[in-house]
Amino acid sequence: MGPTCSSNFLRFANLTAEMQSLEINILKGYPYEHPTMIDMVTRSPQNLAQNLVSLLRGFEWGQVGAVLCEECYEGDELASEIYFSTIEDIFENNNIALKETVRIGKRENSVNISDAITIFEPSARVILLFLGNKLNDYTEFMTAMSMNNYTTEEYTPVIVISKNSLELTFPWKENDAIAELFDKAIIVYNNCYDKSKISSFLSSYSFSTIEETIISLQMYEGYHLLGYYLYTAITNTTLFNYVQPEKAISSMSIPGPFGEIFINSNGQRIAGYDVLVVDKSLNSNNFIMPLGTISTDKKCPDQACLNFVLNSTSSFEPLKDVPLCGFHGEICDQTGVIIAIAVIMGVLLMFIIILTTIRKCCNGSKGRSISNPWVIPFQDVRFIDLTNTEGSQHMSIQSLQRNMEEKQRLQSLARTKHIATVDQVYVLADKYVMRDKLRYDKIDINLLYQMKSHLQHDNLNSFVGITIDKASHMYIIWNQCFRGSLHDHIFTKERQRGTATRFEGLFLRDILKGLEYIHASAIDFHGNLTLHNCMLDSHWIVKLSGFGVNRLLVKWKTSGQIFTEDHTPVIKSEELHYFDPAMKKIWKNYADRNERALITPQFGKKCDMYSFGVILHEIILKKKFVEQLFDSPREEDDSVLIDDENDAIASRFPLPIIIPEGIEMHNDLIKMLENCFGSVRPDIALARKIIDTVLKMSGSLVDLMIKNLTAYTQGLNETVKNRTAELEKEQEKGDQLLMELLPKSVANDLKNGIAVDPKVYENATILYSDIVGFTSLCSQSQPMEVVTLLSGMYQRFDLIISQQGGYKMETIGDAYCVAAGLPVVMEKDHVKSICMIALLQRDCLHHFEIPHRPGTFLNCRWGFNSGPVFAGVIGQKAPRYACFGEAVILASKMESSGVEDRIQMTLASQQLLEENFPQFVCSNRGGRTIEGIGRILTYWLEGVNAGEQVKVVEFQNDLNDELSRIMKKDGELLAAATALKPKDKMTLAKEKVIAERKNEEERLQRQQTLQEALEEHEEEIEMNEVLVDEDEGEGKPKEVDLTSIVSTQMEELEDEPAGRTIGHGRLDSQASTIPDN
């Protein structure tokens, strides 16, 4: 029974075949046929292919296409889809033509898939899909079919799911719209272990995964099959076939625990799959319609065959695998169809021509003719809903509030103004409500005719006409300028431009050109000149709009024919200050014929110059002529021509004119501005001459904008240059900080995006140091005092390390770790660098006074070890360069097991020093028991020979944060530096030690005391015997180091013996390790 590991399948199959033993495969299907093997897997490639063949035959399909995603089954070790070549072979043997096979990736999007599957258009309409074990895996493909308009009337996708998951999961449960994508898709699903059949088995056992459940079910059936076969063979010996048991088993009818088991003559299990179809019209049963189960029959040459018959109760009708007229229409004769289409097109064309003719006739009868070109049929106007025209700028969260405010403004605006199209041209329509049919006299008709037909100028906006709808609304229509009005660009913050101060001359010049043309035309004067009616076209040319309209509106409002939709005044209050008070007085009394007679062409032109004065004031000073005035809706049908209260406010101006500070204005311009509001007003010619002289600008507005953009570009280049320099400076600071945190080579690799892999360094030395008594010192000091102390000490340590070629790995409180030999590889000098660092650090502490405790100095322990380590960068957001290995652990142990003011090292480091750098003086500490490592031999680093000592410049007491300089030449003696200054306490201690060591009697006495102590402590006897032997065999060095130590009380000998304070450190009882002079 087995195997239980897929990698052992062939090995077990060959072994059982050689042994002629029966093997029952329960793990996964394979495309191989092995004697003496019974394959219990329902997911084998052979069973999958036989199910598909029976389905295709049942629907009478002989040619298909396939889409395969091999990556989709990479994580599924039991998948049979990876043996697709076996499925192709079985198709070929059963005369199923596989026309095209498209292979796609696991994360292919629908756009790419839609391009790839176009290969099926000339060859296949039934497409087998092998894209995964879940229906969710097929959503992108179904979307691609929808994108290509592959309808359910043309193509049939067949989703193949060979994995038995005990229950299908439908992706449209949460979103019904997905069911439309899968509509009419056929699902071939392995449901051999239906939950209703295996419920008792599952209730008896529990499994962690579906795969484990399926394998257990197949194992259970395998044991049942074997038992049934053996039981039957005992009672019927003719069935027992020792050489080919699969032949005997295939001939049997085997009632399994979950249903009958069918084995074919090749020993492979044959089991039928379920066939389903997705139907979006079904509101129940998850949009699924069962089409039947592929049944198994033993009445065939292979002893087990599959057969599919569509359920008799199903209404599903499968499509053909080949279109009725072929893939290219080659089967059907298209001549008749072409003739029929041509006839239909001809009839439609005649109908369109007749309809167009009738429409033109109707339009002519409605007044859109040469005589009344200003009358626009309402059906020719296509209105646009401003409140629903949203662009991409409305989609961001930040603009949501602004979008809502804009909607409210547009909804209010839409009550009186509408954007529309007439003859495919965008227009703006002012809306009014009619109480009665409008009455036109000859003057009105002539005015409208002139406005429509004769007023054509570069600085005039085109008047389109007037239209009336069936709901008694009148619309006055003008061409739409989408850059808005000058009022928008001057007083609306969102549309102001910093360069607007340079454009006022061009704006005023365009206004005067248009106004001059109107004054010379048949309509004589504008009558409605405001900033709101000074429009800007796409070329930034000012076009005057609204001319002549006020004459009609005042007449119609006075006679009670019109009012506004929002019941506000016909003449908006925000525009009242543009009109001459004399003109407004006449409008209010327009019903009086004598008052109307006062509006002469000459009077109208003077009123236009008044309006121009207001515009000049607002353009030059960028300031409202009057405070903002607002209209309030009145009662229904009670709107007025002019709001008297607002008009009283507007009429208090314009005099006196006040020029704000900071704005320079030419005297001629001021004089003309004052004259515009006086009794003797300038004419157009004089106004143009003054504007052209005072605000002279060459070229058009576009030319000026190009110049401004050029100047802005040059300034922008300089700004970019300056910002780039600042950025580079900041990057340099960042790089310097990064170089402090990581080695230079590692930092450069990380900056360039190069992965820094861990690396093994065969030759490296690691040094650890730790302040003795730091915890008690912290408890007796303020936090800032501790920080100042550590900062001063580590600044000195860092400078020593940088000068000696080491690298500081980390600093944790008072603990300090230094490495040499990484990341810069050193063959042998790494141990020399560490020795120099340790000695210089020790000497530095002898002169480093605790800032907040004058006269008190720090004591440290040092320990180092040499050997192979591996190092690399840890972390991404806060990367740290760290090293690891047994050598690092042992170096840490050397520090923790050391003695204050002493430098301890391992045998490996001592041997490197002895072989390559004999100038360093070492002494044998002896064997030490190190926790977690065992007993090892350690040494003290005492110093350097007198002829090779390193000269160190004294640390200045008043420079707490910096070490001034350390001499790099090893040949200069430390004695040369100390000769220029009084002897310090360490020098006195050295002399004392030498004197004591010369005393032979004291040395013999100490040795005798040591022997007595060793007799009481067995382990210490062995250690000291080694020390005595080494002292006798190695001889005595010629020089004595500054940090040599003498013992004073041998009876206090311990792992960390007590001693007496000398200088700034502690001298311990280790006299036996110090040779005589």
From Swiss-Prot:
CDD domains: CHD (cd07302). It is found in: Cell membrane; Cell projection, Dendrite; Cell projection, Cilium; Perikaryon. The keyword Transmembrane helix applies. GO terms for biological process: cellular response to cGMP; cGMP biosynthetic process; chemotaxis; cilium assembly; dauer larval development; determination of adult lifespan; intracellular signal transduction; negative regulation of dauer larval development. GO terms for cellular component: dendrite; neuronal cell body; non-motile cilium; perikaryon; plasma membrane. Mg(2+) 2 binds at D770, I771, D814. The keyword Metal-binding applies. Its EC number is 4.6.1.2. Keywords: Cell membrane, Cell projection, cGMP biosynthesis, Chemotaxis, Coiled coil, Glycoprotein, GTP-binding, Lyase, Magnesium, Membrane, Metal-binding, Neurogenesis, Nucleotide-binding, Olfaction, Pheromone response, Sensory transduction, Signal, Transcription, Transcription regulation, Transmembrane, Transmembrane helix. Residues 765-895 form the Guanylate cyclase domain. It catalyses: GTP = 3',5'-cyclic GMP + diphosphate. Mg(2+) 1 binds at D770, D814. The protein kinase domain is predicted to be catalytically inactive. Guanylate cyclase involved in the production of the second messenger cGMP. In addition, regulates cGMP levels by controlling the transcription of 3',5'-cyclic phosphodiesterase pde-1 and pde-5 mRNAs. Involved in the olfactory, light and pheromone sensing pathways. Part of the chemosensory mechanism of the ASJ sensory neuron that controls dauer formation and dauer recovery. Promotes the calcium flux in ASJ sensory neurons in response to onset and removal of a nitric oxide (NO) stimulus and is thereby required for the behavioral avoidance response to NO-producing organisms like P.aeruginosa. This is Receptor-type guanylate cyclase daf-11. The lineage of its organism: Eukaryota, Metazoa, Ecdysozoa, Nematoda, Chromadorea.
